[in-house]
Amino acid sequence: MNYVQYYPTDIVNGEGTRCTLFVSGCTHACRGCYNKKSWSFCAGLPFDEKMEAQILQDLKDTRIKRQGLTLTGGDPLHPRNLAVLLPFVKRVKHECPDKDLWVWTGYTLAELKADTLQRQILPYIDVLIDGKFEQDKADPSLVWRGSANQIIYRFTQY
């Protein structure tokens, strides 16, 4: 798995101060996508042990308290990314149980639940924003969403 960007301190992609990882690879190809550079699975850098350790270190940093981790992209829940992300998310939740996990995906919750691989990550997600970006439903006034078809699911209240 590759990633195109990592923000160790982010206040845009979720509530509170967070770490945000932009994962490479997306097959949805939404018209009007703001992050087309993340569509290729080869874009960016390999997500390696060093980057994994850096994110965990940042989440544990007491000088800059982070509320949690955001995974976006690209599409972090594309099956090609889950072989790496699922063990990483489990590790984050084990080592940082007080941190929340926000995930943006082009898949709907129903699609994720129907897929045997994708549904395995759902128990670790606190907030899921689902659905492809639909340019004809775009609304800049929406919080955390680009288009009105996207739904915010809060699986846990932290």
From Swiss-Prot:
It is found in: Cytoplasm. Belongs to the organic radical-activating enzymes family. It comes from the Bacteria. The keyword Membrane does not apply. Forms a tetramer composed of two NrdD and two NrdG subunits. It comes from Pasteurella multocida (strain Pm70). It catalyses: glycyl-[protein] + reduced [flavodoxin] + S-adenosyl-L-methionine = glycin-2-yl radical-[protein] + semiquinone [flavodoxin] + 5'-deoxyadenosine + L-methionine + H(+). NCBIfam families: NrdG, PRK11121.1. The keyword Calcium does not apply. Binds 1 [4Fe-4S] cluster. The cluster is coordinated with 3 cysteines and an exchangeable S-adenosyl-L-methionine. Keywords: 4Fe-4S, Cytoplasm, Iron, Iron-sulfur, Metal-binding, Oxidoreductase, S-adenosyl-L-methionine. [4Fe-4S] cluster binds at residues 26, 30, 33. This is Anaerobic ribonucleoside-triphosphate reductase-activating protein. It holds the Pfam family Fer4_12. GO terms for molecular function: 4 iron, 4 sulfur cluster binding; [formate-C-acetyltransferase]-activating enzyme activity; metal ion binding; ribonucleoside-diphosphate reductase activity, thioredoxin disulfide as acceptor.
